[in-house]
C-alpha cells in the first residue's frame, strides 16, 4: 500500500481520475469479494457441516478472522500490479539531491498524520479505559458500541472530504503560481462548505432513515451525537481545505503543530469529561478539537498565505443549515404524519437561500 501510494499520487497530478478511481474501486471490490467468499460463504458452510471442493481447497477453519487480513493482502497485491505500469513509466535513477528537501517537507506531515489518527481514534480508547472502573465492563462496552455505531453516520461527510481532497490538492498545487489563484481557492471553499452544510441538513432531516444503518436498535439512543459529529467533520473539512497555505509555502511543520495541538485538546477534554458525561463528552471534544484547529489554521494562514475566504457566506450557510435543523426539532416534525415530505420544504429553503447567496460568485 505504501509503495502504491506513489503511482496513485502521480495519477492525481496527471488528472487521470478514471484510472485512479478504477484502481481504487477494484481494490475495494476485491477486498469485499474475498471477505464475502471466506466469511460469508465458506465459514457458514463449514460450520453447518457442509463443504465442497472450494472449501476443501481454499478454506482452513483454523485461520478464522485471519481471512480478513488475507483478503486485504490479496487486494493490495492486485492494486500494486495494476499500478505497476504507472510506476515503471519514466523510471529514472534515484536523484539523491531531492531526498533532503523531500524529507524536510514530508516528515512533519508524517507527524501530522499520526496526530490526526490519534484525534480520530483516541476518544474510543479513552471511553473504554475511563468508563470501565466506573460503570463496569458491560456498560462501558455498551457506551463504546453506541458511540462507535453513531459515529459511522458522520462518515458521510468524511467520505465527501476525502473525495474532495483527492481532486483538490493536485489542483491547488497546479494553480499556485497562476494569477487569481487565491481568489479561486476562496471560491472553492465557499462551494465546498455549501455542499457539506447541505449534507449535514439532509442527514439530520432524515435521520429516522439513516438510523437503520445501525442494525442494533439499542444503539439508537446515541443518535443525539450525530449532529455534533457531523458539524465537527464540517470543521475538519474546512481545516483540510485551509491546509493549502502551509503546503504551498512549505511550512509543513505548522501542519504537525496544528495536529498535535488538536490531539492535546482531544486528550485533555476526554480525560476530564468522559467519567461524568460518557460518550457525549467524546462527541463535544471532537467538535471543539476540530473547531480550534480550523480557527488557529485560519489565523496562521492569514499571516503566511492570506486567502480571501468569504467568511460571511461560509458562516451563513452553516448557520442556516443548523437553524433549519433546529426548527424541525422545535416543531417536532419527525412526529408529524407527513414529516418526511415537510422536510423537503426545509431542504428547498436551504437550496433557495444558498442560490441567492452564491449568485455573485457566478458573475
Predicted segments, located by residue:
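Transmembrane alpha-helical segments of multi-pass transport proteins
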Residues: 53, 57-65, 116, 262-265, ...
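Membrane-interface junctions at transmembrane-helix termini in multi-pass inner-membrane proteins
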Residues: 1-24, 87, 230-261, 303
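Hydrophobic alpha-helical transmembrane segments
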Residues: 21-88, 261-266, 279-300, 342-350
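Interfacial/gating helices of multi-pass transporter permease domains
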Residues: 61-65, 101-105, 109, 127-155, ...
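Interhelical loop/hinge segments that connect adjacent transmembrane helices in multipass membrane
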Residues: 45-71, 78-120, 167, 171-183, ...
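Residue-level signature of transmembrane alpha-helical cores of multipass secondary-active transporters
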Residues: 20, 24, 68-72, 101, ...
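Membrane-interface "helix-start" segments
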Residues: 19, 96-108, 285-347
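Specific pore-lining/lateral-gate transmembrane helices of multi-pass inner-membrane transport
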Residues: 146-260
Amino acid at each position: 500500500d505504501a509503495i502504491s501510494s506513489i503511482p496513485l499520487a502521480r495519477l492525481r497530478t496527471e488528472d487521470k481520475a478514471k484510472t485512479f478511481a478504477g484502481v481504487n474501486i477494484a481494490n475495494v471490490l476485491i477486498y469485499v469479494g474475498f471477505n464475502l467468499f471466506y466469511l460469508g460463504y465458506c465459514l457458514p458452510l463449514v460450520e453447518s457441516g457442509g463443504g465442497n471442493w472450494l472449501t476443501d481447497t481454499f478454506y482452513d477453519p483454523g485461520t478464522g478472522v485471519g481471512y480478513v487480513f488475507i483478503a486485504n493482502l490479496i487486494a493490495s497485491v492486485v492494486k500494486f500490479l495494476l499500478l505497476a505500469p504507472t510506476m515503471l513509466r519514466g523510471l529514472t535513477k534515484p536523484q539523491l539531491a531531492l531526498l533532503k528537501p523531500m524529507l524536510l517537507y514530508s516528515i512533519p506531515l508524517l507527524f501530522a498524520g499520526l496526530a490526526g489518527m490519534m484525534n480520530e481514534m483516541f476518544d474510543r480508547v479513552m471511553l473504554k479505559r475511563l468508563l470501565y472502573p466506573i460503570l463496569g465492563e458491560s456498560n462501558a462496552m455498551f457506551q463504546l458500541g453506541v458511540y462507535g455505531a453513531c459515529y459511522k453516520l458522520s462518515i458521510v461527510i468524511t467520505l465527501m472530504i476525502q473525495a474532495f481532497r483527492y481532486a483538490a490538492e493536485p489542483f491547488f498545487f497546479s494553480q499556485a503560481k497562476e494569477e487569481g489563484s487565491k481568489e479561486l481557492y476562496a471560491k472553492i471553499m465557499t462551494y465546498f462548505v455549501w455542499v457539506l452544510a447541505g449534507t449535514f441538513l439532509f442527514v439530520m432531516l432524515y435521520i429516522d432513515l439513516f438510523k437503520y444503518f445501525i442494525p442494533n436498535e439499542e444503539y439508537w439512543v446515541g443518535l443525539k451525537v450525530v449532529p455534533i459529529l457531523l458539524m465537527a467533520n464540517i470543521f475538519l473539512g474546512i481545516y483540510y481545505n485551509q491546509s493549502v497555505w502551509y503546503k504551498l509555502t512549505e511550512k509543513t511543520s505548522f501542519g504537525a503543530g496544528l495536529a498535535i495541538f488538536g490531539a492535546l485538546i482531544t486528550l485533555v477534554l476526554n480525560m476530564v469529561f468522559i467519567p461524568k458525561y460518557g460518550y457525549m463528552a467524546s462527541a463535544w471534544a471532537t467538535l471543539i478539537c476540530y473547531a480550534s484547529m480550523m480557527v488557529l489554521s485560519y489565523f496562521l494562514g492569514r499571516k503566511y498565505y492570506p486567502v480571501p475566504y468569504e467568511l460571511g457566506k461560509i458562516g451563513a450557510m452553516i448557520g442556516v443549515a443548523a437553524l433549519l435543523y433546529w426548527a424541525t426539532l422545535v416543531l417536532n416534525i419527525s412526529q408529524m404524519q407527513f414529516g418526511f415530505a415537510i422536510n423537503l420544504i426545509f431542504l428547498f429553503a436551504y437550496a433557495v437561500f444558498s442560490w441567492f447567496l452564491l449568485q455573485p460568485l457566478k458573475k
